[in-house]
Amino acid sequence: MAGRSGDPDEELLRAVRIIKTLYQSNPYPSPAGTRQARKNRRRRWRARQRQIHSISERILSACLGRPAEPVPFQLPPLEGLSLDCSKDGGTSGTQQPQGTETGVGRPQVLVEPPVVLGSGTKE
């Protein structure tokens, strides 16, 4: 691993210099030429930028010894969640035991589903 030999700060600075050189090696395309030529140059430039971004992530993860992105936050299952739009702050449409409050950790469960559309027959 790159961060284990020598000074870790020096290795990180070296990785940052490499990444900076990569980005500087891909300047934005010139505005000359026809519309289609400019569009093609920008498309190829964006593809190179994506490649440089992925290479940079790999360099940093190798240098730091961990992924560059944080671990995603675990969310509760969506099946048990509902929106409580009551204005009075009550528990309209939910069943709760006496003395408990609904918060982020306790999803609200609807007792009966709301009617969104009618039966489809015109009266």
Swiss-Prot record:
GO biological process: mRNA transport; viral process
Motif interval(s): Nuclear localization signal and RNA-binding (RRE): 34-50
Keyword line: AIDS, Host cytoplasm, Host nucleus, Host-virus interaction, Methylation, mRNA transport, Phosphoprotein, RNA-binding, Transport
Basic residues bias locations: 36-50
Posttranslational mods: Asymmetrically arginine dimethylated at one site by host PRMT6. Methylation impairs the RNA-binding activity and export of viral RNA from the nucleus to the cytoplasm.
Residues with the Phosphoserine modification: S5, S92
Keyword Iron attributed: no
Subcellular location: Host nucleus, Host nucleolus; Host cytoplasm
Region (Homomultimerization): 18-26
A cellular component annotation (GO) from this entry: host cell cytoplasm
Chain positions covered by the region annotation Disordered: 24-50, 79-123
Compositionally biased region (Low complexity): 93-105
Database matches in InterPro entries: REV_protein
Renumbered ranges of motif Nuclear export signal and binding to XPO1: 73-84
GO MF annotation list: DNA-binding transcription factor activity; RNA binding
Function: Escorts unspliced or incompletely spliced viral pre-mRNAs (late transcripts) out of the nucleus of infected cells. These pre-mRNAs carry a recognition sequence called Rev responsive element (RRE) located in the env gene, that is not present in fully spliced viral mRNAs (early transcripts). This function is essential since most viral proteins are translated from unspliced or partially spliced pre-mRNAs which cannot exit the nucleus by the pathway used by fully processed cellular mRNAs. Rev itself is translated from a fully spliced mRNA that readily exits the nucleus.
Record's miscellaneous remark: HIV-1 lineages are divided in three main groups, M (for Major), O (for Outlier), and N (for New, or Non-M, Non-O). The vast majority of strains found worldwide belong to the group M. Group O seems to be endemic to and largely confined to Cameroon and neighboring countries in West Central Africa, where these viruses represent a small minority of HIV-1 strains. The group N is represented by a limited number of isolates from Cameroonian persons. The group M is further subdivided in 9 clades or subtypes (A to D, F to H, J and K).
Family, similarity comment: Belongs to the HIV-1 REV protein family.
Quaternary data: Homomultimer; when bound to the RRE. Multimeric assembly is essential for activity and may involve XPO1. Binds to human KPNB1, XPO1, TNPO1, RANBP5 and IPO7. Interacts with the viral Integrase. Interacts with human KHDRBS1. Interacts with human NAP1; this interaction decreases Rev multimerization and stimulates its activity. Interacts with human DEAD-box helicases DDX3 and DDX24; these interactions may serve for viral RNA export to the cytoplasm and packaging, respectively.
Comment field on protein domains: The RNA-binding motif binds to the RRE, a 240 bp stem-and-loop structure present in incompletely spliced viral pre-mRNAs. This region also contains the NLS which mediates nuclear localization via KPNB1 binding and, when the N-terminal sequence is present, nucleolar targeting. These overlapping functions prevent Rev bound to RRE from undesirable return to the nucleus. When Rev binds the RRE, the NLS becomes masked while the NES remains accessible. The leucine-rich NES mediates binding to human XPO1.
HAMAP family: REV_HIV1
Protein name in UniProt: Protein Rev
UniProt organism field: Human immunodeficiency virus type 1 group M subtype G (isolate 92NG083)
